Amino acid sequence: MSKEKDISVFATLSQSMPGNFEIDDNDRNHLEDDVRKMLKDNVRALSMIQPLIKKGTSETFRNSSGSLYEFLVDNEICIHCPSKLSKCPKKRVGYLLHPVYDKDRDEIKNELRECQYQQEKEKALSLIEPCYNSKEAIYKAMDKTLSFLREPGNSSKMIDTTKLITEVAKTALSFDKEKMYKGYHIRSINSQTLDRDVMMAITYIYTKGNIRVGYINCYKFFAGLVDKDWIVQDEAKRVYQKMIHVPVLMLENLNNIPQVNDEILMTYLYGLLQERDKKGKITYCTTSTSIGVKNLIYSKLRNLACGNEASKLADMIFEEKVIKDFDVRP
């Protein structure tokens, strides 16, 4: 019997049958011998199991042999952890089995828990608020970008990307909410998605520093403001209040704003720029256009009295960052 098949058989038995489930005595003895040997070779696991055994009776070990075997095999995978969720070989990525003693059944059972790296991921993603995008998409874009750049020799293949991310990492490391920062208008001239992925990577870098970040898809946000459903409109307006105050704000596709009336543009585009500048909050944006953000903002508000002022605000809030790299990530 293969080890994988062995695990599934004993795991199923231990989960579906109470207490001392019925298997052939010879198989049970072999299983118990295997568990003892595995515990002897795994000091850390032994230190977790011994206190649980002491809580039980003389039958606890025998009752728990199936679940102990399952735990030890799972723990062996964790011992050789690649320290990256994207390389975790488990079917349930980011989760591990944790043994606990069940007094009623006099056996040790396994609870499924998040591993260290999954906990770190969940904590970081929880700091992306408000979020008008998929948090999982943000994580995957970050992982794709940073994993590639960390490989030896790859940073020289994407020099602009590496430089920009390094600059942001330094800012995040010494971030002071009371200090005024200038953000970036990130434009990638040789890739349609690299600028967005870089901004997503930047988002995650800030959250890893325990800094709250808002991530807004501009089309979705402005579409929400003019949605026929008042509940959707109300939610977009609540999000706007968060956008004003969040320490770091990401605006994806700032040029891609749906057809809205002048009042909406005045209140929520010009108003956002005013509030972010007044509060000294750092803001980043991407656009799918070749023009700079100063001219972009003017083009959106040129028919309003605030057009020139909004253009000046954009120039103060954003520094132009052009990424000339070709996207050579796999």
Q: Where do the PLM segments sit?
A:
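Long, basic/Gly/Ser/Thr-rich N-terminal segments
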Residues: 1-116
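Charged, amphipathic alpha-helical linker segments immediately N-terminal to NTP-binding catalytic cores
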Residues: 105-168
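Walker B catalytic acidic pair
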Residues: 218, 252-254
